């Protein structure tokens, strides 16, 4: 077991000492450099701590913490007067000040007095490596405040100190051999050029401010004149007011037009106008831009050429004849393409070969005239017999087959079977076709389609009744005579609900037929057919 360690924590209340903390602390002139052996291992920490001074020399003593009653004891050291802080000047600034303050004489050799902190070899390179602004001056002198505070000569006095390029050589035309003197002259010339540029910029800014003041003064004068004109009761002023009512922009601000004979506009030259326009902080608004004309988004979009829609309702005999000729030519072209085994450029799509019942067909008994086994009505029973020799009228059911040549022709013409039946009932065939049919009937050559029967053979799949019929019952569609089912157990059941449900089924079938296939319809159908699928899966072994 390790022995417990005792730690004594001494809490000291720092009371106000003899030195007031609110007073500004004087800056130190210099700090003692850290000895190289200060952080070496095995060396005592001498010359550091609370009571250590750099003048102690080799005296070794440990740093002691200040006691609590130390501030009550009289201080033995005399309080020295506060020294004003010395601002440390930058090396670049000091060198530039010395360059500007040093007068140049052609006879005496040029010497550069550098401060103590700057190396003697650092000439123009040290100045160029410093931070520079966009005006090729150090960043300390690029600000306006620093330029105003600089203690420099005026431009005229500085030009007298630096000789021009023509006077750079002495009278005996001997060039200066000292390269340092030539560098000094070049530096001072550059500084003078930069100072001239800053002075010109100040003049331009002063002109801009002066122009702005003049503009504001002119606008105030115009406002006062307009107020005086509005208060006058003369007839000429009234006519002017009536005209000025229309000289307003959409924001209600009046436009004041300068007179052509005003002295300010006549004296103003084109250069001054261009200068005034360039001095503006905003883009002037043209007179045609005062009002915004909204444009419809439909006008911005490129319009498609209008498609010509043929009038198929009220056609004249000439139009019908031209359409029939065009249709026949197109059919002949497609037949020729198919004979040459070419890829057809277009196809005629037919919706269906059979018609669905019309809405409210239960009440009108239309759906029972030509029903379809595809539509399984709620209140209709379809009954088939398996007696051989039974002929089912497929045209009644909407399942009539046509010859192969007729199928191809119908596909080319884009006509369905229902439309073909309508044409057969309305259109009268030609005498040639009637003569051919009559000859076939006389010879006993009936069409093969009429001889075919739709007998359902005896097998387990075709039996709809438990017992096989022994007589020709035929194919019939009848209403349920006996009401049997879950609905009829309730004596208060209204049969009209079933008829309404029947019409709803017809409408739903029409919607399913007319709409395009979508994922939502597939989900609805799968939910409705889920019980039937479960029954079929349960029957399978």
From Swiss-Prot:
GO annotation terms (biological process): transposable element silencing by heterochromatin formation; transposable element silencing by piRNA-mediated heterochromatin formation
One Gene Ontology MF term: piRNA binding
Source organism superkingdom: Eukaryota
GO CC terms: nucleus; RNA polymerase II transcription repressor complex; transcription repressor complex
Tissue spec: Expressed in female gonads (at protein level).
Basic and acidic residues: bias regions: 241-251, 269-279
Effect of disrupting the coding gene: Mutants are viable but show oogenesis defects. They also display up-regulation of transposable elements with loss of transposon H3K9 methylation and sterility in female flies. No effect on the abundance or content of piRNA populations or on the nuclear localization of piwi. RNAi-mediated knockdown in the germline increases transposon expression and impairs nuclear localization of nxf2 in nurse cells by reducing its stability.
Region (Interaction with Piwi): 1-169
Positions of region (Nxf2-interacting region (NIR)): 315-343
Subcellular location: Nucleus
Region Necessary for interaction with nxf2 and protein stability: start-end pairs: 387-446
Bias type Basic residues, positions: 203-220
Key words, A-Z: Coiled coil, Nucleus, RNA-binding, RNA-mediated gene silencing
Disulfide bonds: none
Signal peptide per UniProt: none
Coiled coil regions, renumbered to chain: 194-216, 323-343
Main location as per UniProt: nucleus
Domain notes: N-terminal region is necessary and sufficient to enforce silencing of an artificial reporter gene.
Remarks, miscellaneous: The name 'panoramix' derives from the mentor who empowers the French comic book character Asterix to perform his feats of strength.
Role summary: Acts via the piwi-interacting RNA (piRNA) pathway which mediates the repression of transposable elements during meiosis by forming complexes composed of piRNAs and piwi proteins and governs the methylation and subsequent repression of transposons. Required for transcriptional silencing of transposons targeted by piwi and confers its effects by interacting with nascent RNA transcripts. Likely to be recruited to nascent transcripts cotranscriptionally by piwi and to recruit additional factors involved in transcriptional silencing.
Subunit structure: In the ovaries, part of a complex composed of at least Panx, nxf2, piwi and Nxt1. The complex is knowns as Panx-induced cotranscriptional silencing (PICTS) complex, Panx-nxf2-dependent TAP/p15 silencing (Pandas complex), SFiNX (silencing factor interacting nuclear export variant) or piwi-Panx-nxf2-p15 (PPNP) complex. Interacts (via NIR region) with nxf2 (via TAP-C domain); the interaction is direct.
Protein name: Protein panoramix
Organism in which the protein naturally occurs: Drosophila melanogaster (Fruit fly)
Gene: Panx
